[in-house]
Curated annotation (Swiss-Prot):
The keyword Signal applies. Disulfide bonds join C41-C76, C52-C86, C55-C92, C99-C110, C105-C123, C117-C132, C140-C179, C382-C413, C519-C535, C522-C537, C539-C548. It comes from Rattus norvegicus (Rat). Glycans are attached at N261, N409, N423. One of its GO terms (cellular component) is extracellular space. The record marks D267, S268 as: Cleavage. Phosphorylation sites are present in the extracellular medium. InterPro entries: Growth_fac_rcpt_cys_sf, LDL_receptor-like_sf, LDLR_class-A_CS, LDrepeatLR_classA_rpt, MAC_perforin, MACPF, MACPF_CS, TSP1_rpt. It is a multi-pass membrane protein. Residues 97-134 form the LDL-receptor class A domain. Pore-forming component of the membrane attack complex (MAC), a multiprotein complex activated by the complement cascade, which inserts into a target cell membrane and forms a pore, leading to target cell membrane rupture and cell lysis. The MAC is initiated by proteolytic cleavage of C5 into complement C5b in response to the classical, alternative, lectin and GZMK complement pathways. The complement pathways consist in a cascade of proteins that leads to phagocytosis and breakdown of pathogens and signaling that strengthens the adaptive immune system. This is Complement component C9. The gene is C9. It is found in: Secreted; Target cell membrane.
């Protein structure tokens, strides 16, 4: 991790005003007592099979979700699209790839002949380096440059419903024969900027303080987390993490798993999307929606390592992405286009910032806190969130990168009063800790998860320091400007216009298909939330139960 000047991360604690307003009532009727029985997912019947696509030699059908599972009924986790091999009755009008005077790679990619035998993998399969009579003419010659993880991550996709895309459309290991170098002022290291990235800057910034918010109403807390993870295009309280549509099946190619049909970094120990255990953590968080006497302490700290802007024309896309676009049917088939969106995302990042977001939610037991005389400020002091955390790069160690320091005194977890000693970390004050970190290596994420599984409740500033030290190896998108994924379809590709129109429609249908409007309404002003095919009710502060049907005043 990097910083050329001292950046102080002093944890300034403040309490937010609690918003206890009830959500707007739904115009639909509330469920009767019978409706509180488990409601299973209900889908429409399959459509008729489409005509046989003459080029893909497949036909398709689809269905829709009518009602999502609710009140502990079966979730909607089955595919909405289906495909079947068929024998076409029409001829396929194939377009022959023609690179003209350029070199055609074995992958079909066209590159300039000046890129042959330069030591770079310009074709993506090294076929441009396979027939060289002399030593390669290296673009960077004898200059020392390293591959940039920020550059590799730039442009990564976003799913409008919060899912992690499986692959990236951009080949950010293509340099077009250039040796554009970017200097990291903290480590004095030079990195090579990929061709697809028009602008890349190493700029380390960090929040001056950890941002802390506390919520007494579960819905407000959950709503904040959900909206942080979906885009502004998605106004529904709906999240989807599980892939339901099969990857695109290419003609003459056996069906592959999502992992094999995606572009990953060379280091398999680093998760390319850098958000770990997301579904599991949201399920844990949702389990508190109908519980009472809980308080939620939300802690966030952000570190930016750099900024990027992608080229808006002439980008080099991965062969896999282009093949998957070609494998889309010209007619609109919902399941096929949904599968494409779940592979690459609904949008890509045209510009943004890279780094990491450290985010934890502490679930506190209000009754236990009141009984033992523990205040919210006591909990924060126990966790070390009243300390200064300094991120600095001493001059004498600039070449070794930055370091973080903090001193957490765990005696601060002991509170005395009325002749009693309360250990905040052990005496049932902190019920749970849920992590939503973005960025950092999988190793650090696993270490944090193992610590939580052992029952540790004091995930503190020291854990933040360990995580932050791994950001250089695995940065994540922390802010971005989005562009629709269909803008990347090359205009010269056969049927490009039709497929672009289909994909635009698919994004709209995708949001409408997985909408909380297909949930039964909750009672007493509760709000329906859709989480991975299952509807749940988030109750106002005076009610509880799976449908908010029980008054807390009874």
């Amino acid at each position: 991790m990097a910083s050329g000047v001292t950046i102080t991360l002093a944890i300034a604690i403040f309490a937010l005003e609690i918003n206890a307003q009830a959500p707007e009532p739904t115009p639909r009727e509330e469920p009767s007592a019978d409706a509180l029985l488990p409601i299973d997912c209900r889908m429409s019947t399959w459509s008729q099979w489409s005509q046989c696509d003459p080029c893909l030699k497949q036909r398709f059908r689809s269905r829709s979700i009518e009602v999502f599972g609710q009140f502990q009924g079966k979730s909607c986790a089955d595919a909405l699209g289906d495909r079947q091999h068929c024998e076409p009755t029409q001829e396929c009008e194939e377009v022959q790839e023609n690179c003209g005077n350029d070199f055609q790679c074995e992958t079909g990619r066209c590159i300039k002949r000046k890129l042959l035998c330069n030591g770079d993998n310009d074709c993506g399969d090294f076929s441009d380096e396979s027939d060289c009579e002399s030593d390669p003419r290296l673009p960077c010659r004898d200059r020392v440059v390293e591959e940039s993880e920020l550059g590799r991550t730039a442009g990564y996709g976003i799913n409008i419903l919060g899912m992690d895309p499986l692959g990236t459309p951009f080949d950010n290991e293509f340099y077009n024969g250039l040796c554009d170098r970017v200097r990291d002022g903290n480590t004095l290291t030079y990195y090579r900027k990929p061709w697809n990235v028009a602008f890349l800057a190493y700029e380390t910034k960090a929040d001056k303080n950890f941002r802390t918010e506390n919520y007494e109403e579960q819905f407000e807390m959950f709503k904040t987390i959900v909206r942080d993870r979906t885009t502004s295009f998605n106004a529904n309280l709906a999240l989807k993490f599980t892939i339901t549509e099969a990857p695109i099946k290419k003609v003459g190619v056996d069906e592959v798993s999502p992992e094999k049909n995606s572009s990953k970094p060379k280091d398999s120990s680093v998760d390319f999307q850098f958000s770990y255990f997301k579904k599991e953590n949201f399920q844990r968080l949702s389990s508190y929606l109908s519980q009472t006497k809980k308080m939620f302490l939300h802690v966030k700290g952000m570190i930016q390592l750099g900024r990027f802007v992608m080229r808006n024309r002439g980008v080099m896309l991965t062969t896999t992405f282009l093949d998957d676009v070609k494998a889309l049917p010209v007619s609109y088939e919902k399941g096929e286009y949904f599968g494409f969106l779940e592979t690459y995302g609904t949008h890509y990042s045209s510009s943004g910032s890279l780094g990491g977001l450290y985010e934890l939610i502490y679930v506190l037991d209000k009754a236990s806190m009141k009984e033992k005389g523990v205040e919210l400020s006591d909990v924060k002091r126990c966790l070390g969130f009243n300390l200064d955390v300094s991120l600095y790069t001493p001059l004498q160690t600039a070449l070794e990168g930055p370091s973080l320091t903090a001193n957490v005194n765990h005696s601060d977890c002991l509170k005395t009063g009325d002749g009693k000693v309360v250990n905040i970390s052990r005496d049932h004050i902190i019920d749970d800790v849920i992590s939503f970190i973005r960025g950092g290596t999988r190793k650090q994420a696993v270490l944090l998860k193992e610590k939580l599984l052992r029952g540790a409740k004091t995930i503190d500033v020291n854990d933040f320091i360990n995580w932050a030290s791994s950001l250089d190896d695995a940065p994540a998108l922390i802010s971005q400007k989005l562009s629709p994924i269909y803008n990347l379809i090359p205009l010269t590709m056969k049927d490009a216009y039709a497929k672009k129109q289909n994909m635009e429609k698919a994004i709209e249908d995708y949001v409408n298909e997985f909408s909380a409007r297909k949930c039964y309404p909750c009672q007493n002003g509760g709000t329906a939330i859709l989480l991975d095919g299952q509807c749940m009710c988030s109750c106002t502060i005076k009610f509880k139960g799976i449908a908010c049907e029980i008054s807390k005043q009874r």
